[in-house]
Regions:
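Secretory targeting and sorting signals
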Residues: 1-37
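Short, aromatic/His-centered strand-loop micro-motif at the edge of beta-sheets
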Residues: 178-201
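Secretory/extracellular carbohydrate-interaction modules
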Residues: 77-176, 265
Length: 266
């Protein structure tokens, strides 16, 4: 067997020593990157502050209380509230992510879970309601639907609700985005080619016993609706549950990115 010369053996040991720091740097790099990402996310303000959300809202979550009903976060707690992944700031700090999984807690009048903001009085101390037959009531919502549940890929994003049911909303089914009218889910087709993550502006204007609904500034539908106790909602209202969508767990959800929402009453 050939013996290695001292010079060749020393040369190989030197190469190994030189390679070791480079290998160590390569192994540490992803950890440093992950730390930087975490630091960036931590630097984001609370969700409400990220989009300048007014105090005139409360949050309804798909998370159960001890009694099984959905959790509600009211003012002033909502100002600083963050509950990932159900209500949190996007990584670029520009929007709120609202998520509702199919196995989430639901309110008594529905079988579907929601992560939604519900309109309140200006200081958030009481629920707000108004008539469509008097005055002009407007909500502008800047949003993107970013995820759909499986099997039944339906999500509502932004709506007017009255004392008993939703009056009108934006509803995505697969790639088809609709404006609804009460129990008519396909009242008006806005687009048949909606791509998840596409940001759009929706506007609802309730006046004279009807609601005009706009998509990116263009009037798309007018819904007849004379109601006395209307209110606005913004966020993700997943139209699927464990009876019609699988798997029945938190990996199966609807999600909306909310960049801004404003409400005016005149």
């Amino acid at each position: 067997m050939e013996r290695q010369s001292p010079s060749r053996s020393s040369h190989r040991r030197a190469l190994r020593l030189l390679a070791a720091p480079a290998l160590a740097v390569g192994l540490l790099a992803p950890v440093q990157s992950a730390s930087a990402d975490s630091a960036g996310a931590a630097a984001c303000p609370a969700p409400a502050a990220a989009i300048g959300l007014s105090t005139g809202w409360k949050l309804q979550l798909p998370l159960p209380t001890s009694s099984g009903s959905p959790q509600e976060i009211k003012q002033p707690a909502l100002k600083t509230y963050n509950k990932a992944p159900w209500f949190t700031t996007t990584s670029d700090c520009k929007a709120i992510l609202l998520r509702a999984a199919v196995n989430g807690a639901t309110t008594s009048n529905t079988g579907y879970p929601r992560s939604e903001l519900r309109e309140m009085t200006a200081d958030g101390s009481a629920t707000k309601s108004w008539p469509s037959t008097s005055g002009t009531h407007t909500m502008i919502v800047d949003q993107a639907i970013t995820h759909l549940p499986k099997t039944k890929p339906h999500v509502m994003a932004g709506q007017i609700h009255d004392s008993s049911s939703d009056v009108t909303s934006f509803r995505l089914e697969g790639t088809s985005l609709y404006i609804t009218s009460y129990n008519t889910p396909h009242y008006k087709l806005v687009t048949s080619n909606y791509q998840l993550g596409t940001r759009f502006q929706g506007k609802f204007v309730a006046h004279d016993g009807k609601v005009d609904v706009y998509y990116n500034g263009a009037l798309k539908a007018t819904v007849d609706g004379a109601f006395g106790s209307g209110y606005y909602k913004a966020g993700a209202y997943t139209q699927a549950n464990c009876n019609n969508s699988s798997p029945c767990d938190t990996s199966n959800y609807g999600q909306v990115a909310l960049y801004g929402v404003t409400v005016t009453h005149k």
